[in-house]
Amino acid sequence: MAELIEYYGTGRRKTAVARVHLRPGNGKIKINGKEYKSLVEYLRGNEVWEIEALKPLTVTSTNGQFDLVIRVNGGGLSGQAGAIRLGIARALLSYDESFRPILKKEGLLTRDPREVERKKYGLRKARKRAQFSKR
């Protein structure tokens, strides 16, 4: 049996985690076991998130060269799109290390550290307080 060639990368954003497998192919997308024509279908019609998520493939000119097999969970669609983007970028590095300067220049290898700030007791939200009255 022929050995399956596969390149793997993990991406995280907010509370979303994406495990991305790149397989040589023609651009098919499979997310959580379900086939999609494009990422827009999974991201409920938001083309901006699709463009962002597929940016690593665009900047390295590898669009349509790989089939994407993605397992993503946690967070909302925006966080999942960001996690997929980082996962694809890291998987591309395992495919070809010469992509590193291109991906780094575009900022695609950096994990976005921004998380939701926790709510503090005595406050309405993380920072919102009740109105202060001097008298």
Swiss-Prot record:
Keywords, comma-separated and alphabetical: Ribonucleoprotein, Ribosomal protein
Any one GO cellular component localisation term in the record: cytosolic small ribosomal subunit
InterPro entries to which the protein is assigned, alphabetical: Ribosomal_Su5_D2-typ_SF, Ribosomal_uS9, Ribosomal_uS9_bac/plastid, Ribosomal_uS9_CS, Ribsml_uS5_D2-typ_fold_subgr
Molecular function terms, GO-annotated: RNA binding; structural constituent of ribosome
GO biological process, one term: translation
Source taxon at top rank: Bacteria
PANTHER family: RIBOSOMAL PROTEIN S9, SMALL RIBOSOMAL SUBUNIT PROTEIN US9M
HAMAP family on file: Ribosomal_uS9_B
UniProt-listed NCBIfam families: PRK00132.1
Family that this chain belongs to: Belongs to the universal ribosomal protein uS9 family.
Protein name from the UniProt record: Small ribosomal subunit protein uS9
Species the sequence originates in: Petrotoga mobilis (strain DSM 10674 / SJ95)
Lineage of producing organism: Bacteria, Thermotogati, Thermotogota, Thermotogae, Petrotogales
Gene assigned in the entry: rpsI
